């Protein structure tokens, strides 16, 4: 996705992402609505669905396939594997043409069209220009001066999410190392390997964390359960009733919180693989007050916000 995105941007081509799980009908709608003539696909199912659409399409001309293990349909005479696609440029002698295109690029150029799920009817194509990204980066530079090239961001959401796409672009702008999790089912294994300092995510991820932690607490001994619950309540009082309100906490509460933060909370975050976490933006859907309160209580650095796709958020 990132390869093709930046390759497209460099040639003033509009990038239009789709979900890997899109049905042939959904693919066909987007192809026709946006008049897409070239489509990049991943594994076998994506190829099969895309080729089914191409056979009936007057618009879609070529599929470019990332996965070399994909078997082409015997009727397919136009598709090409990604590595072979790259080699087409070896003798294209297109450097001058590309330089001219890049020099003519403008912030007013359309960068991408994001087809959101919507609540009714067909997907809506949200048109985003390069100035949308530039403005997002400008304001993030002001609001998030702590993000730097020492950070590692876990790219967990699909890059069809403008939330993840804009965040990943911002991280690249700041020199942040990007770790891409390709299989959502592997995130519990990936996080302890990567130890991200940054990660944007949707509430559903943190809801699963909340449920998992409370299942562990409820299955522990009465003594340990009492310790965990006291730690969470201490964190709630310190962070929500004092720190977040700009009020100096009583000495005893501050000392108790520091103890739990260095023991219970640090152990919890190490198990999850997020002990180095500095900033975890959360958006895309409502985050329940219960989960939000829990995350802040155990000192997980979430920042909860909202925005429209039209605002690059």
Regions found by a protein language model. Give the residues of each.
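A short helix-loop-beta submotif of the ANL/AMP-binding
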Residues: 1-16, 20-24, 32-38, 151-152, ...
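Structural core segment of the AMP-binding/adenylate-forming
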Residues: 10-88
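Conserved AMP-binding
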Residues: 19, 156-161, 284-286
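Short hydrophobic/charged patches on amphipathic alpha-helices used for structural packing
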Residues: 27-28, 99-102, 188, 269
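Adenylate-forming
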Residues: 44-59, 206-222, 262-275, 289, ...
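Conserved pre-ATP/AMP-binding loop-to-beta segment of ANL
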Residues: 80, 92-115, 122, 146-152
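Conserved AMP-binding/adenylation subdomain of ANL enzymes
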Residues: 134-155, 159-265, 276, 301
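Conserved A3 ("GATE") glycine/threonine-rich loop of ANL adenylate-forming enzymes
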Residues: 204, 283-291, 304-313
